[in-house]
Amino acid sequence: MAADDIDVYGQQEALRRLYERALTTPLPNYAAPTSFELNSAGIASTETYDVIITGGGPAGLTLAVLLAHQGLRAPGAVLCVERRPHPLLAGQADGLTCRTMEMFKELGLYDEVLKVGHEVAEMVMWAELPGTKGIQRVTHQASNENMTPSRVASLVACSQGQIERILELELASYAPGTLKRGAEIIHVEMDARMDTKYPVVVSIRDESGHVTFARCRFLVGADGAHSVVRKCMGISMVGDLSDRVWGVIDFPAETDFPDIRRSGHVHSALGSVMHFPREQSADGDWLTRFYVDMDEANAGNMDSQSAQVGPLTPQHILDRISRTFHPYHLQIKPGTKVEWFSKYSVRRCIASDYIRHDFQGLPRVLLVGDACHTHSPKIGQGMNVSMADSYNLAWKLAHVLLGISSDPRSILESYASERYPVGRQLVEIDKAWNTLEWNTKITGREENYQDTRKDLLRTISGFVSGYGIQYSSGYLIRTARYLNEECSLQAGSRLQHTVMSRFADGLTVDLHDEIVPNGRWKLLVFATQYLSCQKGPFAQAVRSIFENLIPIFLPGCITPIIILPDLVSNVDNGGTSLTRSVDWAVFPSRIKCMAEMKTYVSQRAYDGYRISCHEGAVVLLRPDGVISIIDDLHATEVTSFLKTVVRTL
């Protein structure tokens, strides 16, 4: 081979590595090669995929992006089919709460969202009180009131179309060709032959009407409230349909109402309106969204069989807004127009099941987002919970497909056992909030209304932040306590953020910066102040984690993170020294060798989580950041638990 050829090859390899360094390091692939050889005429040439996602909205794209981040990037790994030829141009979902913003932070997309979104800092309620004429402000609060402190914006207005655009670009950078627009899945069936590795068969129709067939190992229905996947699998929606009619509209508002740029509710004898400040339009005008109760104006035009409502025009909605906001004036800003409007009735339903098994008992078809839960937009959780479904599911699919999971059936079934209760909680909270805030006139509210409202807002705050969601004990969660009762951490919940200083270079980071969704388990080792006593039991326990725990599992699947208190024991004089003042040599050598850039100092973490600096702890985080188990430094229970979920060597 000529020298020039070597140089060209070397340049190509260097260029490839240059681009790959900008991407998340994929999980290693331990799966046995799969083959698809069936003798049936025509079937052998059918396209096959590891995962097919039907629906390219926020839930479907989030799942595709996470799978790509975690290693499913090769052609034929994932196909996402979306009927629309482009991202949503206007309307539909518009609010992102702090857990979703944290997810974007972990994906490296937070700044992209803020660039096109609008942070909502405050919330208000206006009402027409007894004995008064016209509305007046009755509450005024920060949007993050009652919420667990977060390092990200608590509420951001950002159109669904922008979210889809951002996710689509991210997906293209990892796995180009994954998203197929202008096509839709029209039929799904499970292959009855038990020997096939691709048991799910889908029919895909393109824009011209041509139908092709594809097979996959797993199918995810992210195709919305009218899900074809759900219907083909015979999964029903259970719930109720309200006869209340609502209008929703986006436009640049011109008004003397003082709180138009705050999120709020307005109640008067003439109607009820929820207003939500939006981002700027393409023309630079600040948009506002209004949800308007049209019940009195249009109550007779309801088709109770289909959730479709009778004729409703933008002018009908605008007239109701104008009357409700009296004595303030509100109109479309001159020279602008309505950006989007729609009408809906509230259907609060949840799917009877989130998964369907194949004929060997392995979950093969899974539902996410509106395909498995529907509700009103009043607490702004549709897009947020849908994306959280995908966040829960992605790493589980990746672990099965990449041969990491030791029990594929149990890990996939945990998706339904964990997310079904969340979907039901969403429907129940939405119903309670609507009943309290929208279905009762101001004059008819009970004396304890304010106390009831505060309690419900605390529940909603915990739900939207994610800290109020608690997964029950199960295959992936061990709630038994192996640590003293003072520790505030709970298995099945999220870990609150905290600030740390990296021991190697002094860089200040947030613990959540280490909890990225790369598909790896995070082993947090709170190593005590006695780690510097290398012959002591605590240093021996930490050394054993590196020598006897991590090496028995598939390499590259568990990331150790060492957290030290501000003071460590001084073996020379029996006192203590500032951790930042000592050298690596005082700690077991395995730490610098295996976790040099994952060793941190944070007294705040010990204090905030109520972990003793004298006893330490081991906290195992799942790839989605949820606490699986909390153990003492000997990590006996952690080792036993990991053997049930991750393959050993």
UniProtKB/Swiss-Prot annotation:
The protein's name in its UniProt record: Flavin-dependent oxygenase ucdD
Name of the encoding gene: ucdD
Pfam family, one: FAD_binding_3
Keyword field: FAD, Flavoprotein, NADP, Oxidoreductase
Listed PANTHER family: MONOOXYGENASE, PUTATIVE (AFU_ORTHOLOGUE AFUA_6G03030)-RELATED, TRK SYSTEM POTASSIUM UPTAKE PROTEIN
Residues the record lists as binding FAD: Q92, I185, Y344, D370, S386
Recorded metabolic or biological pathway in which this protein acts: Secondary metabolite biosynthesis
GO BP, sorted A to Z: biosynthetic process
E.C. no: 1.14.-.-
Effect of gene knockout: Impairs the production of usterphenyllins and uscandidusins and leads to the accumulation of the terphenyllin intermediate.
Organism of origin: Aspergillus ustus
Subunit structure: Homodimer.
Database matches in InterPro entries: FAD-bd (IPR002938), FAD/NAD-bd_sf (IPR036188), PHOX_C_sf (IPR038220), RIFMO-like (IPR050641), Thioredoxin-like_sf (IPR036249)
